[in-house]
Structures are given as structure tokens and as C-alpha cells.
Amino acid sequence: HREEQARYIVKNKPVTMSCAASPATQIYFKCNGEWLHQKAHHIEEREDETTGRSVREVQTDVSRQQVEELFGLEDYWCQCVAWSAAGTSKSRKAYVRLAYLRKNFEQKPLGKYALLDHEVLLHCRPPDAIPQAEVEWLKSEEIIDPVIDQNFYITVDHNLIIKQTRLADSANYTCVAKNLVAKRRSSTATITVYVNGGW
């Protein structure tokens, strides 16, 4: 059995669910407990190059509208059911979710004055998103890579720590959130590093 994992509908593009079983005399999709109409299936039979056995593969498209019609009840899911002389086998449920990335950051970084050689913390809580947004930080529009510059540390909850400020860390910092749908930028925070007793 080759099985499906969670799939995401981006904007209005349907997702294609596919499933293959060998051996199988029949193979169909069941979505949210209901059998899909035969017309909604695209079934192909082919030979597995390694085993030489016959493989039956089924595909179906799931549209945004289908997922929205189930709104509020539960996640939309499909499962593949195959029959053969040996009996029936079912795949795990594969979920179809509507992908989105909200516009507003839950917490934005704020500019500040920072004393030379001191630690600075910049907060970032990305917008609500499915699938969860990945976060990166920009320093003057360049991506910060803590592996290369170990004076920077990005926490598990997406905050940026400058361990010991250097004069070169005076810059504009921006938090960027991205997923399948879009890329969003927080407002920019300006860090000004100063030397005690003077600028």
C-alpha cells in the first residue's frame, strides 16, 4: 500500500489524492465515511517494475468547495479501500486542509537602543497559519543564519537573541513568516547599539 498524508489546498487549486495497491481487483476512495461517486475516480492498472506484479492506482481531485461544504464539522478526510482475493485492506485516513496565512503578526519586534556587549531580545509571533508558518529573520534585508554568525540565536518560539551586541549589529530587523500560501513581513525594528558614556 502507498498511502497519503495531510494535503493542503492553496487558494483555489484542488489537490489530487492518489493511492496504489497490489494485488487489487478493485480500489476506491471513501471520503468522510461516504463512498465517492465512480465518476470521481480515475483508476489505472500498471505493472510494478521491480516485482512484475499488477498494481492498481486510483486518483481523485478534492476541491476547495468540497472541503468548505464540510465546514465546522471536522477535517475533510479520504481513505482508500482495496479488494483482492485475500480480502479487503484500508489505508489510513489522509486529511485535506485549507491552507492560509493570516496577515497580522501576533507579536512584532520593537526597535530599541542597546548597550554594546549586552544581550538583546527581539520578539516575533507569526500570524496564525495552516500549515504552520516557518519563520526567518532579516538583518538589513539579509537572512540571518545563526550557524554562520553564532552571535545570533533564534529560539523555538521564533524570537531573535543577539547574544552580545556589536556596533555592526546596529541595523533594521524584520521577522518573516512563510508557508505554502504566502510570505509576510513584520514591521521593521531598528536596533541602535551605543557605547556607555557616549554614542
Curated annotation (Swiss-Prot):
Residue ranges crossing the lipid bilayer per the database entry: none
Residue ranges constituting the Ig-like C2-type domain according to the UniProt record: 103-192
Subcellular location: Membrane
Database matches in InterPro entries: Cell_adhesion_signaling, Ig-like_dom, Ig-like_dom_sf, Ig-like_fold, Ig_I-set, Ig_sub, Ig_sub2
GO MF term (any one): cell adhesion molecule binding
Tissues where the protein occurs: Expressed in the spinal cord, primarily in neurons of the lateral gray matter and in dorsal cells. Also expressed in reticulospinal neurons.
SUPFAM superfamilies referenced in this protein's UniProt entry, alphabetically: Immunoglobulin
Disulphide bonds in the chain: C124-C175
Post-translational modification: Phosphorylated on cytoplasmic tyrosine residues.
Protein name: Netrin receptor unc-5 homolog
Gene this chain is encoded by: UNC-5
